[in-house]
């Protein structure tokens, strides 16, 4: 199911699930098997932050076997911590290729939006980087905001936890403007109250290592009543997702 027609259908289904009226966020894991150029050419048309396509260069596995192993590792580890990279984890049961791509070639795949693997010291296949296929924004400009699957998974979790917090704490509440003085015991919520609640939730995200720079986040929160619907409140949230340590660059010099 990695032909152009099925990929198009998958992208449409993923977009539907991510819609505000569905809220059933999903991720797609697949494998492209072929030469370097074949993989680079095939991934160009996807460009989606929910798709992670893993390389398969001359391995004896069926593509669906490697895709299943990759999806299994991702499902388990991202449930534990959506912001933590899964680089270095082995694909259980996956048979490594006798011939590996060079580091420069694997970097070409990563830049194009293909997740890479290596053969570790134990002779097993291990994830090198869990990249997504998203590389350009809607205007066609290069965009690295969803380079890795960790960013996508963190965003999914934050959206879910925000929705759960609102539904648990403010079910059957009434809505008023900030000028209204809420009396003790009243089930009334205002924009300021919702702003305070999202800040408290962001502190939980911070403690869990999902985001950083809460001070800037607080300053960018927008919470306001809708102009056209008196029973709707709108929020704009711009958290800063946690990054991962992937490269350490150093330079050793003699004392001059």
Predicted regions and their residues:
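A glycine-rich, acidic short-motif signal
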Residues: 1-94
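Structured, hydrophobic secondary-structure cores that serve as assembly/anchoring elements
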Residues: 83-256
